[in-house]
């Protein structure tokens, strides 16, 4: 149990309500959940000792799927060769599936303790325990055994319970006793599922009530518990279960059913309750620009942020009061695509324009002055970024080049390098937060890494993982992870390989020879939520990232504590700027989020 991350009980209080069916569908739905960055590793522990149904629900039996021992304990029966869903049930230990279990309480308790302590699950994201009906000794033994086995590795032995009922009053009456049991045992109830809420006609797909309706919802309202959803009786789902064989791939078969689509909503509600409700609240909306807003940028040290626009102006605001501090305009002749604050303790702002010029603006005394104009690009400047100590400024352009400028002691700027490895428009540049490592992304779908090798700035790594334009790049605050986003709506996470052994064992996307300095690999792909290009990404902290783009949606992702490569969608904010696209996101230091869109507005959000 030391490698099991979440433990969930499925309870009913009454037999015959389809608890094992809900357990099965919850496990299958979690495995294929779209809110995670990979399929989840899930275990099902069937502790309904006198009526073990889980083997049959997965098309397994004791004749062909016997439990065997390893040095670590009992090895589960897996649904397929991926070993992503494991099963443990007394049904696998009986000589015949027709054998009855006629045991007294002490023997049942001993079997439950052995199931909890002796099964070698390996690394599991979720362990779902299918419990027997009622609130008797078996339930107490489950809770006590989990507490005993997990007390040294988990703060809470059970993450929560899902309670299953049917609509009838006789079922909800018994479920109320189960609710009281959870209260006395200090088990959090994640929600109520109403099973058998209707009957789906196999011919016309209409759903008809065959019992009373709304019992589960009424129960949830009475006890102020989350209502996860209703599950109708679908003959096609029953037919699928009946036709399963030990060789059937239930994961694939279930994903094709209508029930899987219905149950995915229940699973999403379940996850919302497990992680806690999260949302983005609008703090304020800031207007003033007369064209689309291209970028937002927060000063890393001072209470200032800047916005830039198609209207050729930059507006600077106090991030505490949201009052307008200054407007920079009149210098640039075309849209201002990007602004970036120099990371020093005075207000110096770089401004990049489609007029191919980058201006450096600084507050001197009580006024803002343009102290330098950097020229050299042949076309629109698309992005600018300062190095971690503010010594270097990188600029990139539609002319396919990346320029690196050095700020001298007298605040002049010298061009150190013109990098021309990209074969198309360069969309974005960003620097590592603690090293002089520059990364660029392009319309040619590639990501390039650059370092000063002592004589010049050299290309040290080139990644070809994207199959469309790379619009956004951002390092995590600790610098260990690089996030990238593209025109297909993908958000990838990349990590640096630290040893020669790692280099030898991965399929590298670096097209340069391995002897060069940098070797990065794709760690994971975040859940594909966006329906269109992702133009902007921003880190709140090392475990929280947000993205936005052409679909007008802001998505917040969070990393699981037990697996750095496993991320889930924490929240989706649809229509964050109405019907308009979102071009820029940036977190302020206190975790407020700035967003800028084609509506010309900057919105300030709080993530709760």
Swiss-Prot record:
Alphabetized InterPro entries for the sequence: CIAO1/Cia1, Mrp-like_CS, Mrp/NBP35_ATP-bd, NUBP2/Cfd1_eukaryotes, P-loop_NTPase, WD40/YVTN_repeat-like_dom_sf, WD40_repeat_dom_sf, WD40_rpt
Single GO MF descriptor: ATP-dependent FeS chaperone activity
Protein's UniProt keywords contain Nucleus: yes
GO cellular component: cytosol; cytosolic [4Fe-4S] assembly scaffold complex; cytosolic [4Fe-4S] assembly targeting complex; nucleus
Pfam family, one: WD40
GO terms, biological process: iron-sulfur cluster assembly
Keyword set, alphabetical order: 4Fe-4S, ATP-binding, Cytoplasm, Iron, Iron-sulfur, Metal-binding, Nucleotide-binding, Nucleus, Repeat, WD repeat
Subcellular location, record wording: Cytoplasm; Nucleus
WD repeats: 288-327, 331-371, 376-415, 421-460, 465-504, 529-567, 576-608
CDD domains in UniProt: Mrp_NBP35 (cd02037), WD40 (cd00200)
Residues that hold ATP according to the record: 13-20
Keyword field contains Signal: no
Cofactors named for this entry: [4Fe-4S] cluster
Physiological role: Fusion protein of two essential components of the cytosolic iron-sulfur (Fe/S) protein assembly (CIA) machinery. Required for maturation of extramitochondrial Fe-S proteins. May form a heterotetramer with nubp35, functioning as a Fe-S scaffold complex, mediating the de novo assembly of an Fe-S cluster and its transfer to target apoproteins.
Subunit structure of this chain's protein: Heterotetramer of 2 nbp35 and 2 SPAC806.02c chains.
Other remarks on this protein: Results from a fusion of two genes coding for two proteins which both play a role in assembly of Fe-S clusters in other species (CFD1 and CIA1 in S.cerevisiae).
Entry-linked HAMAP family: ciao1, Mrp_NBP35, NUBP2
UniProt similarity note: In the N-terminal section; belongs to the Mrp/NBP35 ATP-binding proteins family. NUBP2/CFD1 subfamily. In the C-terminal section; belongs to the WD repeat CIA1 family.
Protein name (record): Probable cytosolic Fe-S cluster assembly factor SPAC806.02c
Organism: Schizosaccharomyces pombe (strain 972 / ATCC 24843)
